[in-house]
Amino acid sequence: MQRSLLETEACILSHLKAFGLPEMKTFGYNQDYNILVMELLGPSLESLFQSNNKHFSLKTTCMLGIQMLDRIEYIHSRKIIHRDIKPDNFTMGRGENSHILYILDFGLSKKYWSSTHKCHIPFISGKRLTGTARYASINALSGKEQSRRDDLESIAYILIYFLRGNLPWQGLKINNKDDRYKKICEKKRNTSSKKLCEGLPSELETLVSYVRNLEFTEVPDYDYLRELLSNILIKNNTCMDFFFDWNKEKPNIDEDNIIFTNDYGIEYNGKNEWLNRNKDMCFRKVNGISHNQKSGSSIYSKPVFAINQVPSFKNSKNITSLNINFQHLKTADNSYNGSRVNDTNYTSSTKNIRK
């Protein structure tokens, strides 16, 4: 029996319980409806972008990009790809978490790793597009199976969109959807990273080139991508203080209790300073509590729950059963042929484009 998109999302949310992802309150059925209740969050990045005259500053774009990379790295670590990365599917938190970016909408997500065969899903071509054409990768638009690289390419296009206000392949007047997708794909393929990032910091061109050149099963270097965005902040004498373009005042963060570092040795200590510190040290501290983590750049905080009482629904699904059912979540849209494609088959062949 095929899952509904909402059931797929509920299944994945029950498996992804981490910072920057909405908490699922309950999932169930009520008469003719599937119902998913999750915590109330703030506005989407698309709505904030539109209300900010369709432009974000370099600082805001980089701060958002770093958090996007944090979120997608965690999702990928759980063997899941999102497949519909776009500004509408990122939202800010509320209250004391208003500076935190959340990622939403896992209805099109799937596993890229076969639990049965203990290997990466195989490469397949001739597939229809899953996701949103404007932000989809060149490979996804070309009918190729998606993997981690495609989520990252979509993030790259979002960053350019925020800085430029539009993308070169927007506004094509083609009524037929298939023809429009082909034209968008052609336009993307013919727009080099240099042309796409003309007039923008060189780090962005490097980022676009990197994600476009990743191999199908290659493990992305998320730290390297975060470092590129952090370097832009440093070169512009600013820092990740979570003061975004739409803020009227600086977020109310207890700076005395905030420290974050990452594997490339950059630390923000709450005093508007970027410091070079021990590259092996990586932790988050909020309200005196340290949170060990491999990498990243976000600040941990207690989640805000807007729903105090969760309504009861007929045939509501148990979270535990959803978590068990996650093991049966599909890994490929077509039948899996069992061919082994290991995560380690590819070396980091894209490193030669680094500057």
Model-predicted regions and their roles:
Residues M1-F19:
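The N-lobe alphaC helix and its flanking beta3-alphaC-beta4 segment of protein kinase-like domains
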Residues I138-E198:
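Conserved C-lobe activation region of Hanks-type protein kinase-like domains
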Residues L41-S51:
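Structural motif in protein kinase domains
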Residues L64-G65:
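Activation segment signature within eukaryotic-like protein kinase domains
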Residues I234-K355:
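Extended, low-complexity, intrinsically disordered C-terminal regulatory tails
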Residues G93-T130:
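Activation segment/activation loop of eukaryotic-type protein kinase catalytic domains
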Residues H76-R94:
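Catalytic-loop of the protein kinase fold
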Residues E23-N34:
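Short beta-strand micro-motifs within the conserved protein kinase catalytic domain, predominantly
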